[in-house]
């Protein structure tokens, strides 16, 4: 599969206009109404920032597939659209994926994971029509999507990614936190522009956040969307000023940083002030933070990430991010 990156992520929503207003007010997205025909009773909006394009769709009819999705999962990511050269190339790549084992859905859309579908689209797709990306935007692009899958389905999901979609595994981790545990594998397209973190609970251990997501979401789905920024400290300060709430990290994490990593490219005092996490791989450092979920089911949330050379994910950050979500659950219980 020779895609060029993520074209857009489509969310199915109870109220697309309300969802768009939150993205505009809290995250600074620019909202537009694409000039494409939609079936009666369907509302479709776009939210743009940098190279990020989110498509927000809601339906008035209760028997519409969009409404069915929302009933099952609440508002959530329903389609990951990957960018091909043009419409003809999108059709060719969808056909190739089906030949290699992908399940066809409709047009150039194939099955993905649970109710998250994968759609091949060309650069000429009407949903992508709009101004050139602003290189100075606070949030630049979608770094990755994290997808929770039921126990026992991670290995088949990875095989599907490799065989039908041509992705490769770039990172694997079995994470134990107290009495809980999860498996994770990160798969990436050959171009490096589409990255999925696949998460599976270990049901031989006590239930944790992946189990709770799967229960509340009624199955597999996108747990979070990570936005890459060139200045995560400024992004956190800016979004916090707009009302976005972030998860916190205990001071002991920062006390241990000098022994674990030595000097960090963002000073430790700034990391501590903003609750930013830091890790590194062979290429450099990365900085991450999760937002507090505002989803009625407490499922979907968002992430900010800045990469300073790091191309994968650090084990310490994965553990710290997991623990941050667990603390939030305990505090809100």
Name what the model sees in each region:
Residues 31-43, 60-111, 134-137, 143, ...:
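A cross-kingdom feature marking solvent-exposed beta-strand/loop segments within repeated
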Residues 107-136:
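Internal, well-ordered alpha/beta segment that forms a basic, Gly-enriched binding/recognition surface
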